């Protein structure tokens, strides 16, 4: 059996492949299952270069709502992560199906294809992850700072960020 993420043989250990992971594997879309979170939501890791094709496939599958997109710095000097929470919303669903997608990118050249063209709600969320962490969402139509001034230097939410000209504010007691 081949791992669809690395094209290497997998071991038959306690690796959990959920329903969506099996569906993506059936359609030969590269990914790596990361198990489920505390709510039972399946989590998958996708390579940056596979992000666009997997996003289109998930939209076709029925994930019509981008609940959130966020990003974080994994470790000082390490990689950056972009996280997507997608929901399959239907009129008669009491418990809509959800999935979490994680994309890890190198800190030196953090590029991910934009999903704005699939889910318009990604607009401000991708701009925020660019503004705070410097992740470039390729083909985003308005990728510019959204929270910080355009003249701001650096990426404030990176763990190795040093605040320029920072002065500690003293309490006035």
From Swiss-Prot:
InterPro entries assigned to the protein according to its UniProt record, in alphabetical order: NADH_DH_suC (IPR010218), NADH_quin_OxRdtase_su_C/D-like (IPR037232), NADH_UbQ_OxRdtase_30kDa_su (IPR001268), NADH_UbQ_OxRdtase_CS (IPR020396)
Membrane association type: Peripheral membrane protein
Biological process annotations from GO: photosynthesis, light reaction
PROSITE patterns reported in the protein's UniProt record: COMPLEX1_30K (PS00542)
Lineage top rank: taxon: Eukaryota
Catalysed reaction equations from the record: a plastoquinone + NADH + (n+1) H(+)(in) = a plastoquinol + NAD(+) + n H(+)(out); a plastoquinone + NADPH + (n+1) H(+)(in) = a plastoquinol + NADP(+) + n H(+)(out)
Enzyme class: translocase
Location within or outside the cell: Plastid, Chloroplast thylakoid membrane
Subunit organization: NDH is composed of at least 16 different subunits, 5 of which are encoded in the nucleus.
Family statement drawn from the similarity comment of this UniProt entry: Belongs to the complex I 30 kDa subunit family.
Function: NDH shuttles electrons from NAD(P)H:plastoquinone, via FMN and iron-sulfur (Fe-S) centers, to quinones in the photosynthetic chain and possibly in a chloroplast respiratory chain. The immediate electron acceptor for the enzyme in this species is believed to be plastoquinone. Couples the redox reaction to proton translocation, and thus conserves the redox energy in a proton gradient.
Protein name from the UniProt record: NAD(P)H-quinone oxidoreductase subunit J, chloroplastic
Species the sequence originates in: Cycas taitungensis
